[in-house]
Amino acid sequence: MAKIIGIDLGTTNSCVSVMEGGEPVVIPNAEGSRTTPSVVSFQANGERLIGQVAKRQAITNPEKTIISIKRYMGTDHKVNIDNTEYTPQQISAMVLQKLKADAEAYLGEKVTQAVITVPAYFNDSQRQATKDAGKIAGLEVLRIINEPTAASLAYGLDKMDTNEKILVYDLGGGTFDVSILELGDGVFEVKATNGDTKLGGDDFDQKLIDYIAETFKAENGIDLRNDKMAIQRLKEAAEKAKIELSSATQTNINLPFITADATGPKHIDMNLTRAKFNELTHDLVQRTLEPIKKSLEGSGYAMSDIDKIIMVGGSTRIPAVQDAVKDFTGKELSKGVNPDEVVAMGAAIQAGVLTGEVKDVLLLDVTPLTLGIETFGGVSTTLIEKNTTIPTRKSQVFSTAADGQTSVEIHVVQGERSMAADNKTLGRFTLSGIAPAPRGIPQIEVTFDIDANGIVNVSAKDKGTGKEANITITASTNLTDDEIEKAVNEAKKFEAEDKKRKESIEVKNNADQIVYQTEKTLTDLGDKVSAEDKAQIEEKVKVVKDVKDGEDLEAIKKATEDLTQTFYGISSKIYQQANPEGAPGAGFDPNNMGGANAGNASAGNDKKDDNVVDADFKVEDDK
């Protein structure tokens, strides 16, 4: 059965995992790291970089480097690169393509299905946008699950026989969630969730950036925030300082030649203490405490009922965050999970549940926000309360507001405010064909259906005429089927271009290597090679050099192969002359003349004497 991968699509970093031998395993990326920066960059030549390589060149290419795109999921935000507009779904899909390719390389097979995590407090538009991103990347998203819930799965997989109430505190790069869960007998039941989708490590970085920029401005009269390259250097320095202050009480921020004015170049060289960092970010830390209180209220538990507090997300490494949670809850924090990897591992476990590889696990999640419709007077009338276990279905009967009304508009909203206008509009649809009657007489049944992904379907039915209308919520910020199809095709085109570029690099590198080894070996052999043979090889080398910097890969391959075959023939002739009794066809392989393969020339004999020691050697003239 094909593998289903689990993906933590993060604001700043992403991670991919898979079930192997009944355990979730984090898949390293092509660069050897276990997490991949959620960064996409476009180069001047049209090349697209994703992950660590994209992040590394952000300073020199700030305008075409896209970071933290997850913060714009479910909005109409677009990124303009070289007069082409990209949606957050498309940029996220590029990160997903990278994770998918790394997983395929690791598993040695195609991957087409995934479970992807989202912040628990993501609304319907944001969840649908995440699912669309997966589709664009060539992945069938079998399930969208909440990040804290995924973390609890990874935490509790080996604790199936225990009964615990846990609080998951998830502070990532761009979002924050708190979930209260009850674990017991293989059932992971979410009791309540709360959070802030605009709070995360990026905001801690921004506080530092503003402090450094304001300090520099006070000293030099220059606002670095107006310089895109300088601000990118500040971002990198702020993130580095934040990380260092998690283990040290002081760090140095040194940015030479950050800018210049009429008096010459300007530099930043300042010390930053953990105490100052805590002062700058105190309000952000305090903002994380209210959702803890609200999630406890929603669950019906007291803090004394909570058995464990699980810290998830890279930003939970900040000492002030840990201290604040300890002080607020009065409990020690569980350190048994890797905050960067646990969410992806939980997604892989959910994938294992779907395939049947993981048995006796039942996940019961909740909808994070109240769902309702607008009724007379602009009031938001609730159909499904927040923290309701999903999947769920709820119906309620409404009527018309005017005499003779033959149609009604159903305005679907999500949020906690009492007036519809103050909540998030998920969609609108019209039920027409209602039989004319005095107001209050027609009976219109509105049904909300939330699936296991937290995605909403709404239907309305006139009980008198049987007329029915329904909508799968697709907010104006979400992509249409045609837009998704177009994005899928563009993603495939990018993938093909990336593959072609990779092949081009490999072919050209191979040509360079063959030329180098051929010229080196010719020099080493000296007058062992006749003038005629030497001229023949040099002619072939010239042909390779003439074509290797071009774009005609077939011409490069042909020229390289011609050179290789010519060299085979001549080297074989040399060794036959030196050793007439040697096996025919013996000779050097220029493909194997570098590094550890030097000296391992083929001798036309497959058998190897165990007592023979490979050694580097130098060919010298006979004396």
UniProtKB/Swiss-Prot annotation:
One of its GO terms (molecular function) is ATP-dependent protein folding chaperone. Residues 605-623 have a biased composition (Basic and acidic residues). InterPro entries: ATPase_NBD, Chaperone_DnaK, Heat_shock_70_CS, HSP70_C_sf, HSP70_peptide-bd_sf, Hsp_70_fam. Residues 578-623 are annotated as: Disordered. Residues 591-604 have a biased composition (Low complexity). The modification Phosphothreonine is found at T175. Keywords: ATP-binding, Chaperone, Nucleotide-binding, Phosphoprotein, Stress response. Induction: By stress conditions e.g. heat shock. SUPFAM superfamilies: Actin-like ATPase domain, Heat shock protein 70kD (HSP70), C-terminal subdomain, Heat shock protein 70kD (HSP70), peptide-binding domain. Belongs to the heat shock protein 70 family. Acts as a chaperone. This is Chaperone protein DnaK.
